[in-house]
C-alpha cells in the first residue's frame, strides 16, 4: 500500500514536474511572441520630450498596462531628431520623435522607405498662456531686442532643428540675415547656459528643463521666444513608418493608447509628486525646480489626447520654404494621421 502510494506519488511528482515545467516555459514563449516596437527618441529629456518619461522602467511597470502584453518597447536614445530620422530611413526604427525640420527634410528627400505619418503630439510652442522656446542673454547684456543681435554669436543645439528654424525666422522678421548678420553655433542644450555665463556666446536658446534650471540660478533674462516668430506650431511629435502602421496597426494603437493613458496619469493631481520625481530623476534637475514648471502653465502646451492638426504643422513648413531650407512647399494634411490614437480628435 505504501509502495503503491509511493509509486503514485512519483508518477504524480513527474506529472506535476512536467506540468510545472510547461507552466514555467509558457511565459518565455508568450514573451517571445509579443511584438516589438522600435522607438527612437529625439534627444530630449523630461518636459521637452515627455515621451521619455513614459519610457522609464517605473512607468512601463506601473502605468503602461499594455506594455509586455501587446507590445514591447525597444528604445534607442539619440542625440537629436536628425539622428532619429536617419534611423527611420535606415529601417532601424518604427516610431520616432521628430522635430518639424527633421520631418520635413526626410519627406523632401523621400528618405523613409514607404513613407511616414505624424501620429501623435508631443508639445507645441507659441500657445498663449503656456511656456515657449526662449532665447536668453546675460542680465547686464546690451542686447535688449532682436535687432540688437546683429554681429553677435547665438547658440542652438544643432543646425536644422526646430529652435534653429525659430531663430532664423525671428531674425529675418526683424531685418537681420541669419547667414551674414549673426554667427550661429552648435552647443548641446545642457551646455548653453554655461556658454552664455562664460561669454563664449552672446545669446542662446534654453528650452525646458534647461531654461528653468538656469533661471533659478539668476543672471539671465529673455530676449525673445517662439511666439515672436511663429503662430502656434508643433515643435516635436511622434511619427511612425507607414510600413509599420500597415503591418502592425494593433501594436501602434496599443502603444499610443498607453502613451495617452500615461500622459493623463502624469497630469492627474494625485500623481503629481511621483510625476515630478520621475521628471527630476530623468533630467537630473532639482525636484523643486521641476515642480516650479512641470505640467503647469509654466510648461509647454500638450494636447491631453495627443491630438495634433495639420494647422499646427503647416506654419513651420512654410517658414522653411521662406528660409530656403525647403525647395518646394509641403502640404501637411496628407502626412497627419491621428486615427491610431485611442479617441477621435476633433476636426
Please tell me what each predicted stretch does.
Residues 1-8, 19-22:
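N-terminal secretory signal peptides
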Residues 28-32:
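Sec/Tat signal peptide C-region and signal peptidase I cleavage site
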Residues 190-281:
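Pocket-lining segment of extracytoplasmic ligand-binding domains
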Residues 33-177, 183-186, 202-208, 232:
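Short, glycine-/small- and polar/acidic-enriched structural segments
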Residues 4-14, 27:
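Twin-arginine (Tat) signal peptide motif
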Amino acid at each position: 500500500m505504501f509502495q503503491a502510494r509511493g509509486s503514485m506519488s512519483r508518477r504524480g511528482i513527474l506529472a506535476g514536474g512536467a506540468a510545472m515545467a510547461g507552466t514555467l516555459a509558457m511565459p518565455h514563449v508568450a514573451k517571445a511572441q509579443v511584438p516589438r516596437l522600435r522607438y527612437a527618441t529625439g534627444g530630449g529629456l523630461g518636459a521637452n520630450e515627455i515621451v521619455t518619461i513614459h519610457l522609464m522602467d517605473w512607468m512601463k511597470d506601473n502605468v503602461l498596462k499594455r506594455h509586455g502584453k501587446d507590445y514591447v518597447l525597444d528604445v534607442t536614445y539619440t542625440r537629436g531628431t536628425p539622428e532619429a530620422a536617419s534611423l527611420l530611413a535606415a529601417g532601424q526604427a518604427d516610431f520616432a520623435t521628430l522635430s518639424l525640420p527633421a520631418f520635413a527634410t526626410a519627406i523632401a528627400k523621400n528618405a523613409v522607405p514607404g513613407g511616414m505619418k505624424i501620429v501623435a503630439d508631443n508639445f507645441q510652442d507659441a500657445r498663449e498662456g503656456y511656456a515657449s522656446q526662449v532665447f536668453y542673454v546675460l542680465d547686464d547684456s546690451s542686447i535688449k531686442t532682436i535687432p540688437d543681435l546683429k554681429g553677435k554669436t547665438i547658440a542652438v543645439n544643432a543646425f536644422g532643428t526646430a529652435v534653429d528654424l525659430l531663430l532664423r525666422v525671428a531674425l529675418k522678421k526683424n531685418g537681420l540675415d541669419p547667414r551674414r548678420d549673426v554667427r550661429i553655433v552648435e552647443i548641446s542644450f545642457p551646455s548653453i547656459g554655461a556658454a552664455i555665463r562664460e561669454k563664449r556666446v552672446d545669446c542662446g536658446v534654453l528650452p525646458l528643463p534647461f531654461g528653468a534650471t538656469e533661471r533659478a540660478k539668476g543672471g539671465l533674462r529673455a530676449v525673445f521666444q517662439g511666439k515672436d516668430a511663429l503662430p502656434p506650431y508643433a515643435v516635436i511629435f511622434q511619427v511612425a513608418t507607414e510600413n509599420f502602421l500597415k503591418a502592425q496597426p494593433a501594436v501602434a494603437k496599443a502603444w499610443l493608447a498607453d502613451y495617452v493613458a500615461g500622459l493623463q496619469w502624469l497630469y492627474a493631481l494625485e500623481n503629481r509628486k511621483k510625476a515630478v520625481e520621475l521628471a527630476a530623476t530623468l533630467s537630473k534637475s532639482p525636484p523643486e525646480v521641476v515642480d516650479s514648471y512641470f505640467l503647469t502653465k509654466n510648461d509647454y502646451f500638450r494636447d491631453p489626447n495627443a491630438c495634433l492638426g495639420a494647422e499646427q504643422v503647416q506654419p513651420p513648413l512654410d517658414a522653411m520654404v521662406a528660409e530656403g531650407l525647403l525647395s518646394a512647399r509641403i502640404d501637411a494634411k496628407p502626412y497627419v494621421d491621428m486615427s491610431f490614437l485611442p479617441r477621435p480628435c476633433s476636426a
